[in-house]
Amino acid sequence: MSLKYTCPSCGTPLGYEGLCWKCKCEQERQAALAWMPEQIVEKQRNLIQNIQRLADMEDPEFADFWQLLGYHDAITPEIQRVALAAEVFWPCEIYYHAPADVRDGLIHALLSAEYSSAASNLMSCLAMQGDDKAMETLLELERNPRPWRKGLYVDPSSYAQIGGWTFDKEGQRIRLGFDTCYPMVKGTTSEKSPVRISRAREDTCPHCGGRMVDMLVLDGRDERLKFLGLDGILTATCCPNCVGFLKGPAFNSFTLDGGVEVFPSELFDGAEKTDCYVSPEDYKALTENPFVLGEAPVPLFYGAACQDVNTVGGFANWVQDAEYTTCPHCGKPMKYLAQIQWDTVFDCAEGTLYVEFCPDCHIVSMQHQQT
């Protein structure tokens, strides 16, 4: 059955009149990116005056918060102090790199908490604040748990991961990401780019028989990518059909000259075979997508609240919880590298692929999350 309407911007068939959701998101993003300085100040002022509406996920405050943070890096200490005074502890990103007085207020609230739900929110906030005293507090709570710890699934070191860092048993800080972020933007398939999403391969998946794909090919020698510390090519290879059905992430090792060795994998249900749901048309769309690396860096949270943005570095838009893979070779946590939103590269796909890597062992992990 053919649909009655098409998106006036991109031509996607629709069952309603108007923009498709991706073009609508892009329109809203471009409008927010075009805010003048006085508009940003007005948005900040309104957020301060109505901070409780942020915790209640009410618009325009909720949308304004994410646009201020993600597109303008414009969450000020004043906003953070007002949020603390109002006991607004969600979204935790509001406290990213908050000043020392706000950090001390968060620590006081955490150490005074009686219930696991409050402690969970406050540890997330402290993870986003992220300085040495914040780490000392979470480390102390890991070594000497409070009664509310029994009501939580994970330790404080796992909460620290929300802020892009964690610590080991000796109390040494471990960084889990990068303080630089670049977007993937639409170019052309023939346009030269140091990052490519979804390069076709000839080999097939042992589980479903579908084509394997180099989901991310990244040349760290490009000046924009020097922050990654990769003096060569990283390739992340998996089966786009099966990566969401595996028992754990998909892994491969890479060599800086572009070589790849895919690790054996196991389906979540223990079966040897499964069906391939990715059609030839989907493979074509996937491997001929137009995305190229953007020319300029963007704020770290640029892609952290969007379902239509692919990014390298910065913070991910975790569909579920932040999840950092343990390197199968050295046992250390891997570093978050990139996110690929499936629906940006072929229609009607769900969820997000998160790419992480171990810079010491040259091993990549790819994991899928969806609602």
Task: Give names to the regions the model predicted.
Residues 4-15:
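Short Cys/His-rich zinc-binding micro-motifs
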